[in-house]
């Protein structure tokens, strides 16, 4: 029997252990497996005096020691609990996986301040002992404990599945008489049923924590069906903070210009709630189907006596994040314009559609072999060569248009040498005709090859060296607006020319990073590092 909540602890937060009458050895205490993988790190668990006995020798030995502590959340205790009476324990006496924790001895907590659902309804005598602990951020349990928890299964009392249990109506005071809503003609008691939501893709942050706050509570009930045995003008239903969480967009809609239809609540049933406890009316698009207006009472706004008097034995349980306070409540006005529809039939249709889809997905006829998702690598560079066979790492190409279609953006062609022209300037006119013939012949002998973006850069550079003087340019500069073509080509040329130097610099950076990581690891483990670094320096010199 336990409850969990979120929390953290500052490093170095300790307190002195004073003389105590109850200090049990809880190293063998094991929590449910889901708690070790949950984002909630604080747990409140009931202890048993006959099992978790006081260790007198440990209490005398650790008296005066500094023990880790943390701030105990008051929201987990109803009423004004004496949280200052907690006794924080030494780390060696804590359960596995905990960095801090403390205990309330037998009878230390008053019965009215003891967490709800951690004691039996007919419990008599002093309150049982209680353990409050803060789990480490990452816990690695022994394999034996892991196998034991797998065999035992999950415990039902976890943070995500706590069910708020109402006290029975016969537990009211004798002079008070239950006025349950099921006995009235103007109100009906409904049960909120959530339609099955479509599967969502897995989140890259599986342990993302959404903080639970109850300053305002505005859920989205558009996907909720209200199941009622009798149709009345107004209906009341208990909501779930797990299935119907707070939605900030709904809160913004209630504060904006969007219309929120209102109605008057029966004054003989609902108390006058003002301020933060007032009912919040929702916009029509966030109401359940078949309702023209509705409002919600946030968790803790209505007293437990109200639930005991007006809900009583007919109140359907709903999972809650916090059972120390009363659950949220929905009060809705059924639409008279829209014809009432059969909710059970709608539910059956939803289940039938879900089952048929599941059967079709699981049948052999519907299963198709998965095709490998091979991404098509885009092109990068087009090169003019004088050989019909493409160079190593390249592929043949017919035209520049085909290269653009493959994604190529850079073209490389052989540059014209001007050394002969500078040495014999007087022979330019005589050789003009011969150059034209050579150019026409060379155009016929040129072939196109293209390289992918992940091709070997060494093969591309070697091919460019074999060409002699290679000139790079963009195939279609107009297709790249806002790109400085000259700067891009200059950087690409530097990559081709200085690729070996770039690799050496990266290798040196990785080498230095490994050196620092090993040094920090040795320092953290408090191991001798002189011999290690001498050996490391010898390897570097070699």
From Swiss-Prot:
<feature type="compositionally biased region" description="Basic and acidic residues">
    <location>
        <begin position="415"/>
        <end position="430"/>
    </location>
</feature>
<keyword id="KW-0677">Repeat</keyword>
<dbReference type="InterPro" id="IPR006610">
    <property type="entry name" value="DM7"/>
</dbReference>
<protein>
    <recommendedName>
        <fullName>DM7 family protein GG17591</fullName>
    </recommendedName>
</protein>
<feature type="region of interest" description="Disordered">
    <location>
        <begin position="415"/>
        <end position="443"/>
    </location>
</feature>
<comment type="similarity">
    <text>Belongs to the DM7 family.</text>
</comment>
